[in-house]
Amino acid sequence: MKLDGLPGDVHLTYCTNIHAGESWYDIVASLDLHVPLIKAAVAPDCPLGIGLRLSGEAAARAREPDALAAFREQLTRLGAYVFTINAFPFGPFHGVRVKEDVFLPDWRDAARVKFTADSAAVLAAVLPEGVDGSISTVPGAFKPNGFIDGAADLMASNLMLAVADLAMIELRTGKRIALALEPEPCCFLETTQESIAFFENVLLKPEILGSLAAEANVNQAGAEALLRRHLGICYDVCHGAVEYEDLVAELGNLRRAGITVPKVQLSAAIRLPAMTTELVDAVMRYNDGVYLHQTIVRGAGGLTRYTDLPDALAAFRDGRAQGEWRIHCHVPVFLADLGEIGSTRADLESVLAMMRRGYVSSHLEVETYTWDVLPQQWRTGSKAADIAREIAFCARRLVE
């Protein structure tokens, strides 16, 4: 939904990756099931924005003319509109082991380019006039895969193909869509500073810009302008908090580097000010076996990164991993804590306060996709009711 009273043209939504379903049929059905309830709670008198999650399979089907026509009719009937797409997970995202497979295919793979193009075609077809679009995507690759010889340049070259496609869409339709790389712990782009370095040291290299110039039939200066217009960063507040970033400062650093933030994901992580033996059982309840729960420990020697929660717990039992823990597990933003387990909600509140003061991004998306694996005590109502509660919490903080 559009939020009035904030700097810029700001839209708030939730991401439908919370709903299980990989086929286009499943996704359409989930919208019919959940959107009316959420809209009635948070946007009864105005259109409800939707952050649409598409799998690779669904994106390929959804862009077909008959599917698009039916989807437009469905959105009209629901009183909803789509302004952003989550094209991060390509395959199954619920009910199976996801872990590091969520990053595949990564930006070394032509399948990622096609998935992004399919998603862009869908978004361009349903994006309301006068509203920009965004597509969030994997942060290059899982860290070990991103540092193989030649990987960075290959990912950059494939990203240039995506930028050229988005530039062509704008030329053809007048609709601007930006692709947004989403930094995540233990990935090729993990921190804001790594993201800025990738733009400055890889994407802006003459040979990389030259490939975009050739693809888009522009000169080098035109290629850089297209790059900055159609490629930016999706800042996930949970991810930034897990990295112990000064979120407000890093969002400012992106702006000073000339890197856009097409989307901010409003989310919170688990925080333990000091890990203790007494907390092990409570922490283990979040070891769901489905998602990767990267854990970063801040101790006397600085930050130590663990790819998954079991790795951090094993280190703790071995006498290591002493200090503050932050765990990549999206927890409800309306909860200040989860009993004896803390939350990084204070980091989220600092970003929301920043947004009240000045423009940060046009697209704000609540993204607690873990409802199905959270301990039952934190599922306070129906899924639709909990989603609505998260949207309402963020909306209140943004306009108060």
Where are these regions (language model features)?
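Flexible, acidic glycine-rich loops studded with aromatic residues
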Residues: 299, 304-400
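Active-site beta-loop-alpha junctions enriched in small/polar residues
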Residues: 17-19, 53-57, 87-90, 138-142, ...
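Active-site acidic/histidine proton-transfer and metal-coordination neighborhood
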Residues: 2-3, 96-232, 242
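Positively charged, amphipathic and often flexible ligand-engagement surfaces
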Residues: 80-83, 87, 101-103, 126-131, ...
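Catalytic core of soluble alpha/beta enzymes
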Residues: 198, 212-226, 237-250, 255-276
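Aromatic-lined glycan-binding groove of carbohydrate-active enzymes
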Residues: 250-333
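Active-site glycine- and acidic-residue-rich loops that bind
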Residues: 59-61, 185-194, 238-250, 272-274, ...
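N-terminal pre-domain/capping segments
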Residues: 1-130, 134, 161-164, 225-234, ...
